[in-house]
């Protein structure tokens, strides 16, 4: 999967806020064998100068997520501690059936580094560091070169932990990562509007395959961003693409590729593509568990 890095621009045109909303608000059990790590650390300082303007506060406690299946002999274990409403420590690891971390697998480290120039000792530490730096701003977590799928999986799970912390639900999240998707319709919706729009997203699974993907951005009247001709024209002037093009393209790509990790990032709509993949990953996890309850995301919105 091609992944471009999100660049927070210094655009001063009045259009910038409008265009950035196409890059949305803030994925994946689908990861390649490059996923591995053991990293635990305390948050030293706050992420960026961006100010949170919407989204639920985090409730104090320790929140955990575990994969239930072993992939290439390892499964993810992840935890996040919140104190005084702030993330104070994070832990992310891949363990084998004996509880041994993949970071201690010297053969794996050597083989992966030879192929993609980054091994679990490096990218796990970097992902954890980025989580510490950016806190609840999951969209700002770095995608590590050579470990793209692992990075997107990390972001998906970090997002789920943040949602749990907003709800104060300390029950361990279990991800049936090696399970088949069960038939049904799975739905996710954002609660908060960013530049006048919020995400609505559903996938339909039949015979274990995604047959429909309905991702959209709607305003308070329920009108799709694809129908906003002014927005379309303004965004196309700057990014050469608008919601009328990138929204159906993302939906089409998910049905064709059957995996969020394989969805192509639409040039000019990188942030929206990343958000799409993040939420698609969460919907796939729901389908693997057969949980058709609507996922309500009290999405955290930052000022531009």
Predicted regions and their residues:
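Sec-dependent bacterial lipoprotein signal peptides
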Residues: 1-21
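Bacterial lipoprotein signal-peptidase II cleavage site
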Residues: 5-6, 21-47
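Active-site- and interface-proximal helix/loop "cap" or "latch" segments in soluble metabolic
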Residues: 51-60, 66-180, 190-304
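Cofactor-binding beta-sheet edge motifs in enzyme active sites
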Residues: 186
């Amino acid at each position: 999967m091609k992944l471009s890095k999100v660049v927070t621009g210094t655009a001063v045109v009045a259009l910038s806020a409008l265009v950035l909303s196409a890059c949305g608000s803030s994925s994946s059990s689908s990861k390649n064998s490059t996923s591995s790590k053991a990293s635990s650390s305390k948050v030293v300082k706050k992420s960026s100068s961006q100010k949170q303007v919407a989204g639920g506060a985090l409730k104090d406690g320790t929140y955990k997520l575990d994969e239930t299946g072993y992939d290439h002999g390892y499964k993810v274990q992840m935890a996040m501690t919140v104190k005084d409403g702030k993330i104070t420590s994070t832990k992310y690891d891949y363990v084998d059936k004996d509880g041994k971390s993949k970071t201690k697998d010297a053969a794996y480290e050597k083989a992966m580094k030879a192929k993609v120039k980054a091994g679990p000792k490096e990218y796990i530490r970097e992902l954890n560091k980025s989580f510490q730096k950016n806190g609840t701003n999951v969209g700002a977590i770095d995608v590590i070169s050579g470990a793209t799928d692992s990075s997107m999986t990390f972001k998906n799970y970090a997002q789920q932990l943040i949602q749990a912390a907003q709800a104060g639900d300390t029950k361990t999240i279990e991800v049936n990562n090696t399970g088949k998707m069960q038939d049904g319709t799975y739905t996710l919706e954002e609660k908060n509007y960013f530049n006048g729009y919020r995400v609505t997203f559903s996938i339909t699974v039949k015979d274990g395959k995604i047959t429909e993907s309905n991702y959209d951005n709607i305003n308070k009247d329920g009108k799709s961003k694809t129908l906003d001709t002014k927005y379309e024209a303004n965004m196309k002037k700057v990014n050469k693409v608008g919601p009328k093009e990138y929204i159906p393209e993302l939906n089409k790509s998910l049905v064709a590729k059957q995996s969020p990790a394989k969805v192509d990032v639409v040039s000019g709509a990188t942030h929206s593509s990343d958000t799409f993949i993040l939420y698609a990953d969460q919907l796939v996890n729901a389908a693997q568990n057969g949980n058709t309850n609507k996922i309500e995301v009290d999405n955290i919105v930052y000022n531009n």
